[in-house]
Amino acid sequence: MNIAILDYSASEVRLIKNCPDSWKEEQIEEYIYGEDGLDLSESSTYYMYGDAVSIKQEEYKP
């Protein structure tokens, strides 16, 4: 499973790959927000998770 995290405070998008497939939402949030994990702020992040989550980078086309 992959987790994509949009972190407004750091102005970045993170892609965490190869997380355990057995994780439930509680465990994902503990990893993202917990002191023993990434220790990110809930108020400045959004996340999504799944097997097919990826980041696609594109150039602006006028």
Predicted regions and their residues:
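N-terminal acidic leader/helix
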Residues: 1-31
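Short, mixed-charge low-complexity intrinsically disordered segments
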Residues: 29-62
